[in-house]
Amino acid sequence: MRAVFGEKGDFESWIELVKLVSGNFPGLDLKCYKDVLIEKIEKKETLVVKEGEKVVGALAFSYEEKELSFLAVHPEYRQENIGTELVKKFASLFEVGTKLSVITYRDGDIKGKGARKLYKKAGFSEGDLITVFDYPCQEFIYIVK
């Protein structure tokens, strides 16, 4: 399975994945998320990994902000390097030397254990401790090689 740009036809399957993992995203407003997702698909700021027509991995990002804003892998497909494939594809869209960022959970938060491991494996380094939606988080940084 490989990461490709998301398309309008992936919308419903993507939303099903979001509903499945929504507990891991504090402050997620599904109505607002749907509106933003449509816009991101149109701007080619989404990547998916699919099994048939089913979205099993999804990544949203911003070219302008140089930020990975959403990453999820279907629970039944974890440990298959789907997250790694998505992150590698994301980084490949930017020029060498570009500073990319992602916000994830802080060290010690069980919700962020898998994400932090993935980002570190992909070459991200720990950045500032921040608070998002009244939840303690941490920024991770990656310099495109």
Ranges and model annotations:
Residues 94-108:
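Conserved GNAT acetyl-CoA-binding A-motif
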Residues 25-46:
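Active-site rim helix/loop that mediates acceptor-substrate recognition in acyltransferases
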Residues 48, 54-62, 67-72:
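Conserved beta-strand in the GNAT
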Residues 84, 107-128:
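Conserved active-site alpha-helix within GNAT-family acetyltransferase domains
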Residues 74, 78, 105:
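Residue-level recognition of the GNAT/N-acetyltransferase active site
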Residues 1-16:
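A short beta-loop-alpha structural element at the N-terminal edge
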